[in-house]
């Protein structure tokens, strides 16, 4: 099948590469000429495990092409995917400028019937809006061509996107058109062999499903973080509580790990967009507002601990920071807790020596050169001369460090752990002062000192 994907960012590039791997002919179109040129030369513009060889292999095989020519891409395709960004507007709503620009392009250029598939995360009603817009452009040209617009939301996890795309747990196809559904059913047949993963519904329900799924996961994170705050106040250990409630099969262990807050390109944006959508529909969403409020407060928890230990001013203090990306196995720093923490440290007069296995280039892009930030080549280098270690991201290589080296290298044997990676009792035996999230034992012992 011939497929065009508009947008070669995180969602579009993964989708295109996986479809090409299944044997489809895929054209990727983007307005960024440098990005297109880089992909033609084998340079991948983002870090995602397994993506680079997938892109390079299928490009070399001729199944995956990259272009800045939208006319060529529209003419090429039976199916056209829209996979462009929908960044948050100032009021929290999703900015649909890029989506509607693609719709305008399709309407101006299509010469025959098309099925347009929206992969971008968009508000309810966007499929209808895109269809109307394309139809208007066709009418301007005096054309009335067959057209279907389908909602086909993505459910990829950054850091596991290729695996999620190759082995989806569900494929939602939102359309009332039997023709469009049949085409997508054929497209996704290689992913649907062992069991039927396809869920057909109307487009509006498909659009809401995407937002509801992310809001549900964000709610679980904020819930466990609120319980962590209570555990601290009561002298309980949230890690034991987590195991206890997770053992209930109705709850399970997914997304109940306490920490210094969620970030990334999806959860913060989508919760706000859903709140905005509900407001426009005249619905109150006190639960969703609380989810967002708890998360924003959680991102400041480590800073509160720093002030508790070192005082209001951090002037003359330097902190080692492990983990800049919002989660492991990605270089994405969008709304990452590390950014909130670093910026608060700088505002209090402190300095940061940071290390992340993948996000150093992104940190340089965001912050440039500044005297209060040193980006280090290794996690050990970041420790040198630091007053304490701060952990913001649970990369595997941070889970079992050389604690003897750590204690010898830091000025003071202090760890502020935003991901609960370490055992408080063992660290105490090694002579560390240890602050974690929701581990009342770790805090109680510091207060006794």
Describe each region flagged by the PLM.
Residues 1-449:
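Structural/interface elements that position substrates and couple domains in central-metabolism enzymes
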């Amino acid at each position: 099948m011939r497929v065009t994907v508009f947008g070669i960012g995180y969602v579009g590039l993964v989708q295109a590469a996986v479809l090409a791997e299944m044997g489809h002919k895929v054209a990727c179109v983007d307005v960024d000429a440098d990005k297109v040129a880089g992909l033609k030369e084998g340079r991948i513009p983002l870090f995602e495990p397994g993506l680079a060889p997938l892109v390079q292999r299928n490009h070399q095989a001729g199944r995956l092409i990259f272009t800045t020519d939208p006319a060529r891409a529209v003419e090429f395709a039976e199916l056209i995917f829209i996979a462009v960004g929908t960044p948050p507007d100032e009021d929290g709503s999703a900015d649909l400028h890029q989506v509607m620009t693609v719709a305008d392009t399709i309407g101006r250029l299509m010469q025959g019937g098309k099925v347009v598939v929206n992969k971008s995360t968009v508000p309810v009603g966007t499929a209808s809006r895109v269809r109307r817009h394309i139809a208007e452009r066709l009418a301007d040209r005096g054309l009335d061509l067959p057209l279907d617009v389908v909602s086909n939301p993505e459910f990829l996890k950054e850091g596991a996107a290729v695996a999620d795309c190759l082995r989806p747990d569900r494929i939602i196809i939102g359309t009332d058109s039997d023709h469009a559904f049949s085409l997508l059913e054929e497209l996704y047949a290689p992913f649907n062999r062992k069991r039927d993963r396809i869920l057909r519904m109307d487009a509006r329900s498909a659009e809401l499903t995407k937002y509801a799924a992310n809001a549900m996961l964000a709610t679980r994170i904020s819930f466990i973080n609120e319980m962590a705050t209570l555990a601290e106040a009561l002298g309980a250990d949230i890690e034991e509580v987590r195991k206890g409630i997770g053992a209930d099969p109705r709850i399970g262990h997914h997304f109940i790990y306490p920490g210094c807050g969620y970030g990334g390109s999806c959860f913060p944006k989508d919760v706000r967009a859903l709140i905005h959508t509900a407001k426009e529909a005249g619905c109150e969403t006190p639960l969703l507002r609380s989810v967002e409020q708890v998360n924003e407060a959680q991102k400041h928890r480590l800073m509160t601990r720093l002030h508790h230990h070192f005082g209001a001013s951090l002037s003359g203090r330097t902190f080692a920071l492990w983990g800049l990306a919002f989660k492991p196995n990605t270089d994405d720093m969008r709304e990452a807790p590390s950014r909130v923490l670093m910026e608060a440290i700088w505002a209090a007069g402190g300095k940061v020596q940071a290390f992340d296995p993948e996000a150093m280039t992104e940190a340089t892009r965001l912050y440039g050169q500044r005297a209060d930030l040193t980006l280090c080549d290794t996690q050990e280098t970041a420790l040198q001369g630091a007053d304490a270690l701060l952990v913001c991201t649970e990369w595997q290589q941070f889970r079992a460090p050389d604690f003897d080296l750590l204690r010898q290298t830091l000025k003071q044997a202090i760890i502020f752990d935003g991901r609960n990676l370490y055992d408080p009792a063992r660290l105490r035996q090694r002579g560390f002062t240890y602050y974690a999230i929701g581990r009342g034992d770790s805090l109680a012992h510091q207060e006794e000192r």
